[in-house]
Amino acid sequence: MRITNKLNFTNSISTSMGAQSSLYQISQQLSSGIKIQNSYEDASVYIDNTRLEYELKTLEQVKQATNSAKEMTQNSMKALQDMVKLLEDFKVKVTQAASDSNSQTSREAIAKELERIKESIVQLANTSVNGQYLFAGSQVANKPFDSNGNYYGDKNNINVVTGAGTESPYNIPGWDLFFKADGDYKKQISTNVSFTDNRWDLNKDPDKTKYLTGDSKWQQLIGQGYVKDNSLDADKDFEYDDSKLDFPPTTLYVQGTKPDGTSFKSAVLVKPEDTLEDVMENIGALYGNTPNNKVVEVSMNDSGQIQITDLKQGNNKLDFHAVAFTPQADDKTELNNIIQAAQDEGITMEDVTNRVMTAALGNPNNGDITNLNNPVTIQINGQNFEIDLKQTDFIKSKMTDTDGNATNGADYDNVYFEKNGNTVYGNVSQVIKGSNAYATDSTKLSEVMAGDSLNGTTLNLKVNSKGGNSYDVTINLQTSTVSYPDPNNPGQTISFPIMHTNPATGNSGVVTGSNDITYGQINDIIGLFAADKIPTTTIQANNGQINNADYTQIQQLMKDSQATVDVSMDYKGRISVTDKLSSGTNIEISLSDSQSGQFPAPPFTTTSIVQNGPNFSFSANNSLTIDEPNVDIIKDLDSMIDAVLKGNMRADSESENPRNTGMQGALERLDHLADHVSKLNTTMGAYHNTIEGVNTRTSFLSVNVQSIKSNVIDVDYGEAMMNLMQTQLAYQASLKASTTIAQLSLLNYM
């Protein structure tokens, strides 16, 4: 190889530039502390460093988010703890109010304190931190509760990111706080009529008032009710073997809803010598109790009221109603004549009761126990006796029946909805079978019905409209048809099908199948009549199809009705009708199953005759709820405050509000409410611990990732200095060599 000056020069320049580049790179490493400045310098180092940088940023974001979430959970826990303390204080005050020594003035003072405690609970529920409301769900900018406990947030949790693809909730929605059901609680219901020993005339001798127990006999409950003039002797006619009377049995009607959601009706004869414990065992059997298995507990409280407890936790379907009818003579003489005539004919007093009930249920009554023929005339041994019926109520409510009269104990769901301001609402929650969730507008009636089918089910809808008109509407759920008398020609009937939009056309209708009818559709129908926006001619379906003109007419009528009247399912699954243009309303609504007043027909025996009950109940003179899985904290507290003001120890059928469970019921319910909030505090504590653990773990991970990143990208100063010295030495040697070679000439070799 020929070595020329040009080659030497090229090699010298190349070596010099390489050395300078190495020196520059090492200088950059020493000044910046990292191995590379650009991705092309070392692709593997760059990729690893970028990945670790991303992980560090993610961990930093998680740390910041969990710090913020921790602050929110801490504030939420403090608010919940304070709420539990307030509920405990509330219970102490109610216990104090329940003392017999309190005057009305002292109860009013206690009620004011309870009102302040309730207001404090609402204020805690409206706690905000840094402009965010703790219990508003995901709508943290909106105040969640008003003073009445109405909720304006949502049911959503807020989640904090705790890692790649992982989240953790860190709030309790206000819905859960004030309304969510507790699956570990049982439903407990009660009558509100106290059973007393009526062998004495308690109007004349109120000091002899004595509440009955399970050991008491049925004849003690009827007492002077066997005759109209209260002339019976409490000892001779009831107790002494040689003189006690052979009183007629009582017909007891019971209806209700079992724990599994099915309904029933029954009729049975109760003998005068039967104990109330016998009657309660019979009631338990109607709900499904057997000698080896109980599904409900039927008992009597200290005020002589029957209480029924569902033994399965989380169930929310249990319901009860009962009324009894006993043949009543004018006086003791007539009663003895009836007894003697029965003996002469060779019949029992059970036969006498059956004859009385057969006449009471005959024309024009047609089997409706809410409107019995009374008095009735029956024949015994050829003699005619005019006999009255003594009614024994189990439950009383200050409602109005569908005839416009005040309800009595025989009325069940033939009542108008309750009214509050510009809203009327049913008092029976529609509960989905299986899930125990409240029905919404989209819920199908078939998901709630007590039976297995809607075949033969007809609803009676009575409406006194916003415009002052009255409508008597029949909703046939089997045929999906609504019919009513023509307001302009009552002898003619107008009808239209229950329909929904035809998905194929979008501008015509399809008849909704029986099992697909929703509460929203029923509510729309109610709205039409409440707002006086009804079809004036019959609408016919053709092979299940509704043409465009008829469909458009119905849709426009519904739209017009919704401008003045809102009908929907409220937060407790009840049908609610609101008059939008008024602070009060003259609208009245009644909705009931057409078969609700019909019971098994006589003759009756001492063994219950049982048949299926109605598929639906929307508003009813039914049992009172002492406790249930669902809560409604503010409304519950309002009811308790009212009980304190009225001085009601227990539910009282004669009080201003007979459906209030009283202070004893309040104390039992308060234990549930406090436990409900405590469990949510525990849940929040679990959220806090999870987030705190993530926060701590993130801090450690950040250190570890930073250490790994340092190993990947950070320069080793010792190694860099050695490389610098070596490079400098090599560079200097290169320069020296280049200089020496450049100075050489041919003369050096001559």
Residue map of PLM features:
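Bacterial flagellar/type III secretion structural subunits and associated motility module proteins
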Residues: M1, F9-T10, M17-Q20, Y24-S27, ...
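Amphipathic alpha-helical polymerization modules
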Residues: M1-N148, V160, T166-P173, D274, ...
